[in-house]
């Protein structure tokens, strides 16, 4: 199917594994991918390079990058001078939580979608193997869909309202790793680490690295990223 004959979908593409798989799922479902990447002042800016690579590799119809610098607000290890924790995934909301990030990002993606003529929005949030961020939960996604249709011209005047797709929401990281392989994606195209080492290597120890490594290990698949030899062990990894 030619790209110009496919229905457009706005994809929030961070450059991470989840957003890459989400974009490919949208494409598999017949959508033309209009990807939006947001530079929010994150310390792991390497993910922006990954987003560009992913958009090129999957043949996105359009890829737009915008700045929404959240560093001035502070309050997160990803945008402030706060150490990224390396002690494992806990039960509390960690300091890597960026205040209202997905609320901000989905608002921007909705604006991008409306301007692009897209009414389907895809986001790669996950509520199983994740760090406990409140803006990844199903009830947030459901409530935002209502808000998007109340707050936009498209939602008020058109018969086809915005629909928010979160295809990974109820998948484990192992499921997502398997989807990556099934869709023919290279895991090394994506980036997950919050605290990159010199030479742009993943640390292997932050929450995001641990969850990703755990997922590939449980799926029995090799991850294409090069983790340091002294990274904390993950059961089943390299088995």
Curated annotation (Swiss-Prot):
Cofactor-binding details, from the entry: Binds 1 zinc ion per subunit.
Swiss-Prot/TrEMBL keywords: ATP-binding, Ligase, Metal-binding, Nucleotide-binding, Queuosine biosynthesis, Zinc
Keyword Nucleotidyltransferase: no
Listed CDD domains: QueC-like
Enzyme nomenclature, EC number: 6.3.4.20
Top-rank EC class of the record's enzyme: ligase
Described purpose of this protein according to its UniProt entry: Catalyzes the ATP-dependent conversion of 7-carboxy-7-deazaguanine (CDG) to 7-cyano-7-deazaguanine (preQ(0)).
Record-stated family: Belongs to the QueC family.
The protein, known as: 7-cyano-7-deazaguanine synthase
Organism: Erythrobacter litoralis (strain HTCC2594)
Lineage summary: Bacteria, Pseudomonadati, Pseudomonadota, Alphaproteobacteria, Sphingomonadales
């Amino acid at each position: 199917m030619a790209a110009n004959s496919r229905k457009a979908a706005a994809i929030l593409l961070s450059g991470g594994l989840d957003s890459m798989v989400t974009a490919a799922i949208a494409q598999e479902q017949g959508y033309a991918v209009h990807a939006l990447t947001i530079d929010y002042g994150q310390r792991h800016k390497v993910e922006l390079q990954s987003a560009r690579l992913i958009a090129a590799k999957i043949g996105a119809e359009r890829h737009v990058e915008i700045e929404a610098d959240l560093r001035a607000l502070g309050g997160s290890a990803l945008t402030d001078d706060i150490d990224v924790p390396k002690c494992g995934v806990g039960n509390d909301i960690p300091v890597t939580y960026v205040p209202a990030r997905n609320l901000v990002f989905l608002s921007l993606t909705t604006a991008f979608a409306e301007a692009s003529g897209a009414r389907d929005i895809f986001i790669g949030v996950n509520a199983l193997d994740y760090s406990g961020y409140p803006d990844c939960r199903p009830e947030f996604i459901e409530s935002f869909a209502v808000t998007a249709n109340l707050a936009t011209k498209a939602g008020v005047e058109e018969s086809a309202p915005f629909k928010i797709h979160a295809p990974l929401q109820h998948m484990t990281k192992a499921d997502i790793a398997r989807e990556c392989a099934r869709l023919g994606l290279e895991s090394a195209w994506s980036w997950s680490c919050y605290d990159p080492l010199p030479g742009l290597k993943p640390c292997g120890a932050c929450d995001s690295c641990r969850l990703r490594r755990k997922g590939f290990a449980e799926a029995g698949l090799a991850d294409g990223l090069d983790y340091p030899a002294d990274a904390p062990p993950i059961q089943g990894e390299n088995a």
